[in-house]
Amino acid sequence: MAKRCLANWGRFSLRYGAKPTEPDYIVQNLIQLPATLYASASYIEKYGRMKNVCDIVGHRFISTLKNYENIRFIDWLHKAIPEGQICYRTSDYSSMLAAVTAGMGIAPIERWIDNSRKDLIPLFESPEDWTNNLWLTTHRDAHNTPKIQAFTQFLKEELSNINLR
């Protein structure tokens, strides 16, 4: 039973960043997710507040272990921030959030976080080129099945309720 269930769910995926290009999949843009740099109040008190993406001197940053060139703000982080200003690297999103919350440094985070994390402060408006898309991919053979259509409709309705500013 579990094997069959997994096979059925394997006919769709959520992808973040660049548009998927696999030929056997139908790709739908679910939502655009703007991002900006965030810091905690304790970080701002100690190091000051960045004014824009060029104002990096004297600031500490939280980064990912590897670059994800398909995610614009992660790519910026890896290309624009000198190694000596990276104070912590992580491979997962929850560790990045915890490090920013603890005041260790600044990190790029999607704006939807504003809805649930009042302890994180957006430093400025989202740079236009930092908006990434969330894509739903469904295998062409399963795209029109009732299960996939119901899930797609549910997902689109839920995502339309997110306040992204």
Where are these regions (language model features)?
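Acidic, Gly/Pro-rich loop/turn segments at junctions of secondary structure
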Residues: 1-89
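Residues at the C-termini of beta-strands that transition into short coil/loop
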Residues: 16-17, 65, 124-127, 140
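Short beta-strand->loop
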Residues: 27-30, 110-111, 119-131
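Alpha-helix boundary recognition
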Residues: 31, 54-57, 100-101, 115, ...
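Hydrophobic hinge/microswitch elements
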Residues: 80-122, 144, 152, 160
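A late-sequence structural motif
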Residues: 126-165
